[in-house]
Amino acid sequence: MTPQDFIAKWGAPGGVPGPAHALNEEQGAQSHFLDLCELLDVPKPGSVEGYHFEEKSNVVGGRTGYADVFMRGVFAWENKAPGKNLDAALRQVLSYSLALSNPPILVVSDRLSIRIHTQFTGHPSRTHEVRIAEMDQPDKLALLRRIWLDPESFKPRETNRDITEAAARSFSTLAEGLRRRVASPGDSPPPPPPPRPPGRPPPDPIPVLLLRRSRGPAAR
C-alpha cells in the first residue's frame, strides 16, 4: 500500500471522505491497523509472540477491558472512530496499562491522527503526533516505524531526576540572589536632584499662616 492509497482510503483528501472513512470504531479498528502495518512494512499482529489484537486487561473497579492492539513490553494501542476524543482514549488505555505491565509507549488514534505517548519509567512523558495528511512525508513514516523497530529511541535523554535537580538549582540560585539583596548594607542613597537651570529663581517658600489666639481685655 502506498501513502497515497492509505490517505485516499482512510482520510478525506480534498474534503472527499475515502471509502473507509465512515466505518465505525469496531468496523475500522483492525483493518486500519493492518493497512498501517502494510504501509510501514512492519510486522502484523499474530506474527510474533505477545503481539495481537484485543488484549484482555483488568481495570480499576474490577471491570475487564481490552487494548485494541498490544505488543508485550513495547506498546498498547487504542483505536477510535474519526472525531472521537483522543484524550479520553488515552485515559482509557492508561487504565489498562497497569495490568499490561506498563508498556513504555501508549498510542491512540482516530484514524485521522496518531498520537504517540511515552511513559518510560524514570523519564518525563513526551507526545508525538502524525496526521493522516502527513502520511506521505518520509520523516513521519520513519517516526511511526520506530514504534515497532526502535521503541527505545522514544526514550527521552533527560530523566525525572535531571528535571528535579535542574529545578532545585534554579530555585537555589533565586534564593541566593534574594538573600544577597536582604543582606546588603542598606539601599544606596537616592541620587541628588538635578541642578537648577541658570537664571531660574528658587521656588517660593510655602507660605505659613500664623494663627494668633485672640485675647480678651487685660485684667484690671
Predicted regions, residues:
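Acidic-basic catalytic patches of nuclease active cores, encompassing PD-(D/E)XK
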Residues: 14-52
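N-terminal, well-ordered alpha-helical segments
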Residues: 30, 34-35, 67, 91-94
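Active-site metal-binding core of divalent-cation-utilizing nuclease and nuclease-like domains
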Residues: 43-72
